[in-house]
Amino acid sequence: MFWMLLCLFTIVACSDENHEMLITGPEIPELDHEPSIEELVEGINNYPTKFKGDKQGKIWYKAAAGDDLYGYEGDVYVHIGINDWMYVPTEWGVNEDKYKAEKVADNIWCFTLAPTVREWFGPENAANIQNVCILFRNDEALTDEKKTSDFFITVTGDKTFTPAPVEIAACPVEEAGIHPSADGTSVTFALYDLDTNNNYKDYACLIGDFNDWELSTEYQMKRDNDKHFWWYTVTGIDPAKEYGFQYYMGSEEDGNVRIGDPYCEKVLDGSNDKYLVEQGVYPASAIQYPNGKTTGIVSVFQTKPASYNWQVSDFKIENPDNMVIYELLFRDFTQAGSELATGTIKEATKHLDYIKSLGVNAIELMPIQEFDGNNSWGYNPCYYFAMDKAYGTKEEYKQFIDECHKQGIAVLLDVVYNHATGSHPFAKLYWNSKESKTAKNNPWFNVDAPHPFSVFHDFNHESPLVREFVKRNLKFLLEEYKFDGFRFDLTKGFTQKPSDSNSSGNYDQSRIDILAAYHETVNATNPNAVMILEHFCDISEEKVLAEKGMKLWHNMNKSYRQSGMGESSESDFSYMRNSGMPADGWVNYMESHDEERVAYEQGAFGNLKDAPLATRMKQLETNAAFFLTVPGPKMIWQFGELGYDYSIKYKYDGTMGSDKNTDAKPVKWDYFTEQYRKGLYDTYSTLLKLRNDNPELFSNDAFKAWNVSVSDWDKGRYLRLESTTKKLVVVGNFKNEQINTNVYFGNTGDWYELNGETLNVTNSDAQSVTIPANSFKLYTSFQINN
């Protein structure tokens, strides 16, 4: 997943990493007067050094030799915003006069914010401007981009706030977070604040709808030095109303910062929510972002919210060791064209009958905890207790899970605890603005990841604070949303042991202990819940984790891509099982969100690239026959059952990228009406029905023979299962020509095919069987009800 996270930097809207009164980016010279042309240094110059909101501001760019814009003769424009790009008045590449820079000399351009900085950005954004973000670019930025780095210029306000002396008092609550009173008319806020040097901020205040976002000593928080909490109780609350709020914290050394509550269950995002309202995903009647009154992500609370009436309250996974999981991304499951509004929970719920008919018994949702922006895979989390509004409301999430449970389908959640974005309150609280990373004194995060597989900001899982946070979040998700388990992203990174790409997967007892502690929390909250790890470490470590009850992703994509293309090399399936692992310890998959689609490579490369669709789908049916019949947990990536053949490199604009990307992919529900693709779906469904109806035959004790190496290619691959009363044999021909092979059945008599035909076996040790090209035969010792 590591490479995919790199892509996220390009697709999330604007992350909320504004840290007030601080300058990020390249150094900008301090000036005590407006500079002459001769005084300008290479790079950015601005006057005044700190803009005043009610005064004019000027910015010069002097290009140095080697810069993109050095010697450029065309028009130059600025791309500009405020508060670390939280508000940007125009799309990238818009060439309007308002954004045009004045050329004042060769390789020197000037841009002026007039009549004042605030007036230039407009009244709706005039309040709480902390910094101006700017870069200079050419006039052909959409086709031949030339630009500078980002520069950030501090803006000082017209108002000043002088905090009162901090009152030391015992906090009435035991946990950080939001604590309503029994009657809902008051609420106590508690925020943990103690860095690794045992220091804390100079003061903290509450701002929000309850005080019209005014910073005042009346709402200055008290300090409990035993619990290391800032806390305050707000009275006069309407229990039926939602309120937005933030913590405003300051110190002489670090300046001021606004953060939300890390335990809040809903947030408002001034940069992105408006699009959800326009699309009808987020109700216009619900609480909205307080534009013009604050900046950054806003937390929301309600002291007496309506409770969801669960229709199924006692769902249990029947057999976690034999699950078939359907990995699903809401965004790309029902999206049509550019209408992101269709990629929602409501639309996905309408297709649950399709998933149920397929025969899977679990859905694994890609990350849905609040992430930066609206358009994402979700591996860029910022608020873990809030579900992202990009797909729907809290109630709709619960309705989806409830409907799945009604249909006998478990719901697993992909959780991302390896890292968080800079929008996370813990990251913002102790932040190194010059380096754009968490500070050395941050008690939750590493400055740099000790392992090579991380982006954003790396959690330190040796920290008791991090462990408490993760455990609390897991318990919350199991109890509040009734998730049936989790897939943990990038657990290889849950360590403080320094490593490189060659050693990161080596046996690590500290990593085992950390994951075992999280598993204990999951198990204590719901003994039936499952915990799956994206681990990819040495098998000796994976074995220990599996023996403790966890399951681990196991990537079989390469082998099944090769067989899907009709290529025998590197197509060995035998790696699906290993004598060193507990038989049910691996969750095997042919495809996942991270892997290239088998059907795409089949149509683009290999022996079948010019074959008709009917042939290619038959080959994929044969793949499925040697995947879904193997005992142990399995996972299917969405639409693999229809031969989805758009590459993971496919870009949103319809072109092919040079590497994998997280762009939205076309949703091809029309594939379900195409004869041969529907035939592939039907084969999946038939195999899964056979699996679900005969669990004793798909237990590990029933696994008898597995001849699926490269050397078995020409004579046909073979699988045999036997329980005390039932037997199953699969023979597969991945070649593009018919084969005749001798098959071991174990006993003579009638055997039954999936299509209802009967084979009379007369030679139990070597029955001659003809297998058509690109096909399989599945025989059972009992009649199958299809």
Predicted region positions:
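Glycine-rich phosphate/pyrophosphate-binding loop
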Residues: V277-L329, D572-V587, D594-R616, L620
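Bacterial Sec-dependent N-terminal signal peptides
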Residues: T10-I44, V166, C171
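Substrate-binding/active-site clefts of carbohydrate-active enzymes
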Residues: C264, L268, K274, E278, ...
